[in-house]
Structures are given as structure tokens and as C-alpha cells.
Amino acid sequence: GNWYAVGGKSFLAQLFKDAGADYFLKDDERSGGVTLDFETVYNQADDADFWRIVNSFPGTFSYEALKEQDPRYADFRAFREKGIIYCNMKNTPFYESMPTEPEIVLADLLHIFHPDLLPDHEPVYYSRLK
């Protein structure tokens, strides 16, 4: 199956960098969306601490629901160690509001990557999947 990510020169890639993350496509020259095959992502990011997912899942999305989509997802370190960063667009107007509130997105990411920096932050767009 296909895997959708953002290029290394994208707005979100810059926010990852600003939040102290080492994005697996940081050297990619594209500024928009990138479509990759599973094997490419697995080879480059299977040991990543975090994995960002944005979808419109009906109901409550979970690790089990993700594994049902593709059992290979459970092989990723971010899956095994509960490092999935999640936004459900059914509950959050991600694409409508996020571009105008980069400081909130950055705070969400900082809260996830470095919880000691913003311990009282209430996530708006991204939170850790439960």
C-alpha cells in the first residue's frame, strides 16, 4: 500500500525540526505531499520514535484499529512503544485551522516530544494515540 508523508521542505517538516524531531524525510527537497511505498518507509523509519497519523476515522482510533489495517504496522518501533502522534479530522478541523495556528501545532509537538517543556499544555491538533 501507499504511505503519505510530507516532504522535507514542507511547513510541517519545519515544525518537526523546530520541535526537536529528526524527521526521516528531512533531506527530501519537496515542499508538498509525498507518496511512498511501504517498503521505502519501513527501510527508512521502522526505528523512529514517533509516527504521525492524520485521518478521519469513525469512532475511536486505536493501535488495534491501526493493526487491523495492516499487521505489518505493528513492526514499527513507534507502534510497539506507543509513539504514534494522532489527529482525527472528524473531531479537529486540521487542514482548515492548523495553517493559521503554527504556534499551537508546535506546542502540541513539543508537548509530545519533550513533555517536560510544556507539562500543562492541552493538545489541540496532535496527541499521543491511546
What kind of feature is each model-predicted range?
Residues G1-T100, K130:
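Binding-cleft/active-site segments that stabilize strongly anionic ligands or cofactors
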